[in-house]
C-alpha cells in the first residue's frame, strides 16, 4: 500500500484525542487543508461517524472508520484482517484469552510486537491493512 514514506508524499500523521480533536478539524476547514480522519466506530457507525462528523465532511476533509460495527476499534480491525498471521506470530501460551484480547488490553505492547515481527522477519506482504485505512491513505495521497 505505502510505497514510500508518508512525508515524501507531504503527508503528516498526528494522533489527536479528546476535546482537541474537533478543533483540529475546525482549523483544517479554515486553512482549507486536506485532512483524513481515521477513527474507531465504537460499535455505532451512524452515531459516532456519520452524525458526529457531518458538519466537517467536505472535499478537503474525509472520515474513515470500519462500517462493520464488530470492528469497533483499531486492534479488532487489525485482528479480523490478520487473525491467522497474528495467532501464528504474536500469540504466546500466556495469552489465555486469545490474541485479540491481548491486543485490546495491551495496545502499545501489541503494536510494538507486531511492528517487530513485520520488520525483523520482513513479513509485510503477509500483513493485511484494514480496508478503511487503505481507503483513507488512497484518498489523502
Where are these regions (language model features)?
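Acidic, Mg2+-coordinating catalytic modules of nucleic-acid enzymes
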Residues: 2-141
Amino acid at each position: 500500500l505505502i510505497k514510500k514514506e508518508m512525508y515524501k508524499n507531504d503527508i503528516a500523521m498526528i494522533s489527536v484525542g479528546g476535546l482537541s480533536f474537533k478543533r483540529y478539524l475546525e482549523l483544517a476547514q479554515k486553512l482549507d487543508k486536506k485532512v483524513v480522519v481515521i477513527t474507531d466506530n465504537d460499535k455505532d457507525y451512524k452515531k459516532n461517524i456519520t452524525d458526529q462528523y457531518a458538519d466537517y465532511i467536505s472535499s478537503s476533509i474525509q472520515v474513515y472508520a470500519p462500517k462493520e460495527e464488530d470492528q469497533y476499534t483499531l486492534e479488532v480491525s487489525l485482528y479480523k484482517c490478520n487473525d491467522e498471521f497474528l495467532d501464528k506470530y504474536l500469540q504466546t501460551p500466556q495469552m489465555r484469552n486469545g490474541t485479540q484480547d491481548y491486543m485490546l488490553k495491551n495496545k502499545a505492547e501489541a503494536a510494538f510486537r507486531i511492528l517487530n515481527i513485520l520488520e525483523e522477519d520482513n513479513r509485510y506482504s503477509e500483513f493485511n491493512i484494514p480496508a478503511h485505512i487503505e481507503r483513507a491513505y488512497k484518498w489523502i495521497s
